[in-house]
Amino acid sequence: MAFVSRIRRQSDYNTYPSSIPIVIDNGASYFRIGWAGETEPRVVFRNIVQRPRHKATGETVTIVGDLDPSMMKYFDCTRSGPRSPFDSNVVYQFEIMEYILDYAFDRLGANGSGIDHPILITECACNPVQSRSKMAELLFETYGVPAVAFGVDAAFSYKYNQLHGICKKDGIVLCPGFTTTHSIPFVDGEPIYKGSSRTNIGGYHVTDYLKQLLSLKYPFHSSRFTWEKAEDLKLEHCYIAPDYASEIRLFQEGRKEAEEKTSYWQLPWIPPPTEVPPSEEEIARKAAIREKQGQRLREMAEAKRVSKINDMENQLISLRFLLKQVDQVEEDDIPTFLSDTGYASRQELESTITKVTQSLRKARGEPKNEPAEYEENPDSLNNEKYPLMNVPDDILTPEQLKDKKRQMFLKTTAEGRLRARQKRNEEELEKEKRNQLEEERRRENPESYLEELQAQYKEVLERVEQKKRLKTNGSSNGNNKSGGIGRGERLSAAQRERMRLLTTAAFDRGKGEDTFGSRDEDWQLYKLMSKDNDDDDEQPDSDEAELARLSSRLQEIDPTFVQKVEGELSQTSGEVPRVRPLTEEDYKIVIGIERFRCPEILFHPNLIGIDQVGLDEMAGTSIRRLPHDEKELEERLTSSILMTGGCSLLPGMNERLECGIRMIRPCGSPINVVRAMDPVLDAWRGASAFAANLNFLGNAFTKMDYDEKGEDWLRNYQIRYNYL
């Protein structure tokens, strides 16, 4: 099996005789393994397993313990997160446990597949028989160990400190571990499991709570708050408050003591480079680049225009040639002749030639030629095309009167088209004249012309956006101070007028004499009351046309110009907070109230939604559960309370626990809370001293015993700690 490890493999495994036991402290956080009789474990690592794939070969490898960050580039860990063999503090994933034991025995120096040393392994208090039996089966069947013994880690820590005079033979051990907390009373040096208690709260929850609080407080830096970093911050900054309520009040009032108790964590920060104003040479260089880009764009546009003119000239030549061929064809055969060309008649072909000719003249910059019908004298136009216009009605027949009305309508329409064409021609001439003047100004001073054009564009854009806002929100007299937008403020002017007319028509119904319709103006109300009237406001106005012209012009002469989309100006012109550059203060993590708020869950688990008792109440629960009610025994127990486990390293733990227990005990009861010499390693050291005793094998059981007595026998199995 391929292992990835940074732990050095031991080389003296074969020097130990088979009678020397191997001691394992199988904690939910860390796995420790070593030899009996020694004071330090040989191998220590995180009790987790990862099985990522190697990016190059695709092989699945096993990583036990923490992964070296420098090796992350070689493995794909996205599909395989860290896995623990524990559920709370009970081993239930024995496949993961086998990976961990394989790795531990390999790092200890074991060769081959068998382990010929007795094993003492720790477990939690009141471990379920299913977990205990499967662990024994794994050690016997997979590794072939000769004998196995199970012991409680907190009990080994208590007995080890009892040997060194830290605690007495009667007392209570409180062990806030990684995922759970246990309270076990000791009477005459032996644990009384009937009086033990457990809560599902531990150091993991403290670390996770700190990680969540900091991520909510600094969402910009949430990726920095990894679980490992939160664990380091907990060990470095967290403490137990003597009085949680008063400590909270201290920070709420912002006293000087609160500032002194605040810690800081400075994240790496690199100041942004200072912006140096461009030199005159740089400005000139950029202007030359812009001019060069503008010239290239103009050349591209000119080449495109020439290509378009050539295409239209070729099209016009082919159309005129086709028209000559049509002239040589009989009138009845023209539709058949034109069937393959896409034209239905001679008139359609001539209309196409006229349109192409007009487009060609426009592309060349020449003035358009008006159709012949508009170049004629208006008098001859009236006399020839509309002969009935000047004839009196009294001498015309009914049919001629109808023709006269039709001719009058056609004449009015033709005159309207003529006026529209003349107006368009005048506008085009004015536009060409204006373009020529602007081009002359641009050639004289390009920089000044560009700045002026940009200012005009911004001004027109603001007017257009203002009109759109007025159409959306309606007019306001400035008396609305609430800042809200109700239905009346959202209606446009046309919609409000229509609502007024509808309301007036409804309330005026039946009042007085109804004379509606006697005047032609009355019928205009239907148009005003129609919803289609709202679309009139949506027609493009002169400002929008001017905006389009300025935008097109800026795109021609300024390659860096980006046209603003609709609504962008309204977003930027509102009261939007200005984005300031990030400073060193933005990368400083302030850890104030979190220092004692997170560890407080050990005493009040309800802060994170766990409805269980805290550490101080657990001690009282263990005393009440004892089978004999003796006051002297209770006093002996409270006078020797040992704190062990990783969370007992938090500053202020002993004082807070003693204060909490004193509140639930009778007045004058002796209370003494002490901390283990090494809350982290004393469990392994106690187990090592126990396994080194000559009577160790009397507390262990062999595979033969396991096979003969069965799984139920392990239910009542318990070692005698007084041998230590």
Curated annotation (Swiss-Prot):
Q: Which Gene3D superfamilies match?
A: 3.30.420.40, Actin, Chain A, domain 4
Please state what is observed when this gene is inactivated. Moderately dwarfed plants with small organs composed of small-sized cells. Higher density of developmentally delayed stomata. Hypersensitivity to DNA-damaging reagents such as hydroxyurea, methylmethane sulfonate, and bleocin. Differential expression of several genes. The double mutant ref6-1 arp5-1 is insensitive to ethylene (ET) and exhibits reduced levels of EIN2 associated with a shift of the chromatin landscape to a repressive state at its locus (e.g. H3K27me3 and H2A.Z).
Keywords of this protein's UniProt record, alphabetized?
Cytoplasm, DNA damage, DNA repair, Nucleus, Phosphoprotein
| Intracellular or extracellular location(s) | Nucleus; Nucleus, Nucleoplasm; Cytoplasm
Q: Where is this region: Disordered?
A: 358-391, 412-450, 467-488
Spell out the SMART domains in the cross-references: ACTIN
The protein's matches in Pfam families, at most eight in alphabetical order, are given as:
Actin
Q: In which tissues is it expressed?
A: Expressed ubiquitously in seedlings, roots, leaves, buds, flowers and siliques.
Keyword Coiled coil assigned to the entry: answer is no
Q: Is Lipid metabolism included in the keywords of this UniProt record?
A: no
User: Recorded GO terms, molecular function?
Assistant: structural constituent of cytoskeleton
Phosphoserine PTM positions read: 542
Which family is this sequence assigned to? Belongs to the actin family. ARP5 subfamily.
Its name, as the record gives it, is Actin-related protein 5
**Organism from which the protein derives:** Arabidopsis thaliana (Mouse-ear cress)
